[in-house]
């Protein structure tokens, strides 16, 4: 089933040569032979929860090969990488290998202890033992199967594009990302892109617009210069006879996400991984934020990354995303790129700070036709690192991306929308949390004597998005703006010091950012990240009984106090203390309508 799901993928071929006309002199007799080691979790794939077995053969004529077998259940091989080389070895423990194909040279030291061969290079060591008869038999059987995934040499980057945006928006990923990127992806050793996309429902009011396949179908393919879009449909799950399975497959299930990343990494392994979400983001929602949706032993979920309209808009949560990455890789991803709305909230980002080095996100609703993600990936190809790629992304899209917010305002007959997009380093989030903890503690301590001033700040802080009907949904407010509003209204020196520290922490964490300000009445000169803000009554409202139509899993306070963000900052204690409902605040899309 997994092999069938790699629909539309380019046929992968081994990235090494099998030239056998080697004349290099081999090493000492001690190291000649076939050697085996368990390298589970130490490869450049995301096969961390499966076994990986390495077999290296060193021949007496100075030639050698290394195969890595990727296994299920210890004895079922799924994929194999193959590399051949020439080598020289000296009696004093020096080993030099020249890789066939790319001619790269690797050096190591070798030693023998109790019949085991240890190789050391770049501060890392690997101990191999002579391949026994049982393993030899298994390897022969695995190679005879003939349908193993051929795992190529790792690229510099593999970018995962995972999503579902709905039938009215499917065309955006088609022309806004796939068609734009296709001619650029020519070098498999540099950046590879692999997509998993579920097409939306055919809405009667807005006919289905997808041109590559049918509603509910799932496409799983590598995007490169050779991708034939006309053949995607024939490789989709529905065309393969799995129509109901495609519609029932939940994007929100971490098992689906893990399967996608796990098998994709065999076809497109990389030294660095980027995970991009393409879809609708709901930010953080405390009423659907409870532990144990799929894994009952785990805690701290933050829901709202991406929904699946074929499954009652069920949401993937941030813990499940974190779990999927941690279960597959011992090293963090390079970047998580949220190409969706409202994901620049601290409740969410706190959960992800240990599974990725960078996060790209917007605290506002995001306006994009795919140009920003396209240019980010193009920047990776040219610069080879995320910060410079994001810098190029902004430079190349500034005159196209920012006007989209104004166009959206006109289409919706709204006051002008604001926006933002930022890249932050996750290892610099903790100072933000530490300053937020001080702010929460100071708010609780000073509220009895300075309630009126703090209430003024609460009702004037900038809100990133205001739900048209339900005031406590997406109640996300700019943290730095709140700290400064409180300091200004109270005149308190400690609040002022905290606001200064929050500014410094954000400045240190943000590697690159752009703000979009079309609204000249309700805006901030610079946007940071959001936090939830409720009054005591709302924080404890009986949502389970009073708002059943929202399908809540818990009340706000129950969900909020299970987040890592609350556990590190105590922010929920302030929400429990605050008596002022922040309604009517300055917001994106607030104020006077555009002049036509």
What residue ranges belong to the model's regions?
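Sec-dependent N-terminal signal peptides
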Residues: 1-6
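Bacterial Sec-dependent N-terminal signal peptides
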Residues: 8-38, 122, 127-153, 595
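Contiguous, well-ordered beta-strand patches that form the walls/edges
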Residues: 41-47, 63-125
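Structural recognition of the beta-strand scaffold that forms the well-ordered cores
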Residues: 158-162, 192-197, 273-277, 334-338, ...
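Extracytoplasmic/secreted cell-surface and envelope-processing proteins
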Residues: 168-173, 202-206, 283-287, 343-348, ...
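Terminal, contiguous helix-loop blocks that mediate binding/assembly
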Residues: 262, 266, 290-596
């Amino acid at each position: 089933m997994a092999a069938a799901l790699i629909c539309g993928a380019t046929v992968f071929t081994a990235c090494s040569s099998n030239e056998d006309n080697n004349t290099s002199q081999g090493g000492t007799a001690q190291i000649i032979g076939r050697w085996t080691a368990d390298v589970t979790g130490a490869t450049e794939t995301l096969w961390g929860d499966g076994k990986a077995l390495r077999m290296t053969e060193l021949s007496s004529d100075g030639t050698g090969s290394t195969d890595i077998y990727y296994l299920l259940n210890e004895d079922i091989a799924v994929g194999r990488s193959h590399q051949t080389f020439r080598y020289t070895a000296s009696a004093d423990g020096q080993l030099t290998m020249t890789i066939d194909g790319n001619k790269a040279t690797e050096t190591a030291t070798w030693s023998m202890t109790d019949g085991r061969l240890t190789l050391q290079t770049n501060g890392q060591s690997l101990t191999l033992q002579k391949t026994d008869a049982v393993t030899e038999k298994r390897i022969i059987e695995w190679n005879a199967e003939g349908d193993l995934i051929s795992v190529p040499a790792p690229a510099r980057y593999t970018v995962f594009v995972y999503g579902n945006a709905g039938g009215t928006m499917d065309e955006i990923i088609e022309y806004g990302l796939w068609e734009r990127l296709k001619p650029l992806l020519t070098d498999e050793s540099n950046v590879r892109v692999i997509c998993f996309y579920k097409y939306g429902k055919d809405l009667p009011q807005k006919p289905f617009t997808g041109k590559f396949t049918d509603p509910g179908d799932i496409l799983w393919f590598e995007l490169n210069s050779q991708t034939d879009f006309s053949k995607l449909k024939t490789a989709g799950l529905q065309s393969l006879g799995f129509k109901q399975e495609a519609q029932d497959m939940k994007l929100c299930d971490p098992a689906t996400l893990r399967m996608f990343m796990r098998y994709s990494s065999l076809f497109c392994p990389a030294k660095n991984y980027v995970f991009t979400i393409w879809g609708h983001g709901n930010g953080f929602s405390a009423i659907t934020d409870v532990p144990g949706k799929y894994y009952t032993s785990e805690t701290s979920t933050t829901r709202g990354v991406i929904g699946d309209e074929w499954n009652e808009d069920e949401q993937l949560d941030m813990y499940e995303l974190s779990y999927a990455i941690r279960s597959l890789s011992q090293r963090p991803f390079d970047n998580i790129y949220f190409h969706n709305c409202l994901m620049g909230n601290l409740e969410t980002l706190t959960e992800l700070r240990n599974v990725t080095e960078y996060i790209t996100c917007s605290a506002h609703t995001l306006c994009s036709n795919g140009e920003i993600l396209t240019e980010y990936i193009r920047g990776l190809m040219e610069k080879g690192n995320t910060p410079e790629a994001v810098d190029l992304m902004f430079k190349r899209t500034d005159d196209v991306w920012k006007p989209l917010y104004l166009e959206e305002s006109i289409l919706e007959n709204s006051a002008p929308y604001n926006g933002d997009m930022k890249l932050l380093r996750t290892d610099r989030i903790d100072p933000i949390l530490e300053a937020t903890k001080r702010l929460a503690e100071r708010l609780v301590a000073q509220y009895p004597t300075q309630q009126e001033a703090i209430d003024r700040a609460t009702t004037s802080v900038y809100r990133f998005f205001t739900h048209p009907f339900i005031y406590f949904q997406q109640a996300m407010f700019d943290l730095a703006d709140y700290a400064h509003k409180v300091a200004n209204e109270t005149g308190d020196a400690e609040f002022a010091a905290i606001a200064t520290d929050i500014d410094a922490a954000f400045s240190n964490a943000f590697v690159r950012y752009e703000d979009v300000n079309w609204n000249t009445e309700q805006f901030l000169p610079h946007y940071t990240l959001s936090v939830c803000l409720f009054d005591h009554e709302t924080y404890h409202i009986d949502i389970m009984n009073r708002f059943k139509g929202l399908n809540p899993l818990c009340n706000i306070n129950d969900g909020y106090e299970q987040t890592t963000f609350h556990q590190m900052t105590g922010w929920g204690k302030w929400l429990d203390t605050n008596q002022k409902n922040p309604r009517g605040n300055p917001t994106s899309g607030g104020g006077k309508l555009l002049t036509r």
